[in-house]
């Protein structure tokens, strides 16, 4: 437990009311955006390449697991992780501060392969995994860095300034995403707005942690957004994941996988947010057109 309830640790100091107000305003903003602009909720006639039409960088959640059958590694110390050069560099050399198989509790963490970056991405929840695939498919995303560690010195200063207990271990933010226009946004993925209600057992801990992350990224000139899984279009994420498995033409074995390859490269646009796409049905009767489209696109690259 990174933070204990404030009244038990610092009886003379209450949780910063300004922190509570700011975090709650963020949650309400996320809820308004998803309700009115419908960025992540299901829509009919959804044209995937234009799914993220809003100029801002939207919002999105979490639970935790080690995949069944996957080898669970012994937890490494922060010192060892730093010595390994985690969170340094970009592209296929990047390694997040926490790996999926280093999670101490049973949940839904998984390591997914990013065919664009050419590396494994470690997601610590189903929500993080779904969020990753949606962001990966966006045209304006340049770089995705998961489990980005925070400077312990900066975190300590923030905690001291606000009377928060200083965490023993180094903190990390779920995602730091760099966009093609050069802007960067840090995302914290949470299960839903219920976690931010006073009745939630996680209420105090979550508010403090989110405020620390908010203040941290603010000091580095980076926007910070809370992402709620309840606003995430899980169907869209699943369809994107199915197609991205065939991003590399070496995995293409027939007309159905040819179509998935074309969708992964956005050479073909199909509705993917309403229901799980039945590619076999789409292929039936269109085999010749799909083969020709695949040949033209693949040969032209």
Q: PLM features: residue spans?
A:
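Helix-turn-helix DNA-binding segment
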Residues: 1
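Electrostatic, structured charged patches in enzyme active sites and in nucleic-acid/phosphate-binding
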Residues: 7-10, 16, 20-301
